[in-house]
Amino acid sequence: MKANIHPQFETVEVSCATCGKQHPIGTTVTSIKIETCSNCHPFYTGAQTFVVKAGPVDKFNKRYGITQDQKVKTVSSNADNQKETTEELIKNK
């Protein structure tokens, strides 16, 4: 059998970018960096974390300076007026 053909197997610390915890594993790679580990991943912790990203609507509103006050009123105020007119129509019959 040939000598020195297998890669060197070492114990390496896997470092998590989110929580900073390091987990020792055996591998042939010299270093491993991961985004989330079992210590901080929402599936294992049960906690929900949301990454807030600006979507296309937010980008549009920011570009044209539209604020929450300037947005269109909802239909609910219009529905109240419609209910009153329906009641008035019934009374007038």
Curated annotation (Swiss-Prot):
Key words, A-Z: Ribonucleoprotein, Ribosomal protein, RNA-binding, rRNA-binding
InterPro entries: Ribosomal_bL28/bL31-like_sf, Ribosomal_bL31, Ribosomal_bL31_A, Ribosomal_bL31_sf
One Pfam short name: Ribosomal_L31
Stretch forming the signal peptide: none
Region (Disordered): 72-93
SUPFAM superfamilies, alphabetized: L28p-like (SSF143800)
Any single GO BP term: translation
Coiled coil (UniProt feature): none
Function: Binds the 23S rRNA.
Name the UniProt record assigns to this protein: Large ribosomal subunit protein bL31
Annotated organism of origin: Onion yellows phytoplasma (strain OY-M)
Gene (name only): rpmE
